[in-house]
Amino acid sequence: MEKKKTILVAPLNWGLGHATRCIPLIRELLKQNANVLIGADGMALDYLKREFPSLDSIIIPDLKVRYPKSGGYLLYFALRIPRLFNHVKKEHQSLRKIIRDYKIDGIISDNRYGLYHASKPSVLITHQLFIETPSFKKTVHSIVKKLVSKFNECWVPDVESSDNLSGRLSHAGNIPSTVKFIGPLSRFNEQNKQMQPERVALAILSGPEPFRTALEEILIDKLKELKCKALLVRGVVSENNEETKVTADLTVVGYLSSNNLLKEVE
């Protein structure tokens, strides 16, 4: 009998988007009889552990980045480039021990540029091949291209045609041959659709701070004005995840499982 392959799936912990789009990939790996090891940090790890409680998981420390509250983003991140490269180097070095300890056969890394290996199939998931900056675009694109080239393949969760989701972020220039457009990734299971017509409005948040909190405050004010049944999913994973009534019509909750969120969407 052929030995089951063990695949490390490791999303970035900047909001929950990277973790949630790994859910359909993990499901497909399990369907193909692979062992899956989840490697992440913070809320991304907590969320995937709740989605897949039977899977093994490990903490792979993430680069802690908090966006400035107002302007100066280019300078802010330019000053942190040495720190970014140092983190990528440390991440790459830590992968050797993970591969040895858990007998890893392949790696799927969502925007974690240090998680590649010379002798193991390594895939990077990203839709940011051509990061938009007000200046130094060529330099930034060159850096991203070099980082992407370390992986055997780069999967873009979008379509290749002009009618796409990510726009210039993944369609703005010459695309390396290792890039594969795999189509949008959804954690929703078509078989679990159930109608839930109770609420009229649904807002789903995710992303790095302080922007997530700032947008949450704006959305709460706007949803109050609607005066209809509404639910705000904050995109925050915590032990206490009870729904909170902000008004008679507006309910707020930290996060929802894929199935419960699908009920609200439908």
Where are these regions (language model features)?
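Donor-nucleotide binding loops and adjacent catalytic segments primarily
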Residues: 26, 169-171, 183-266
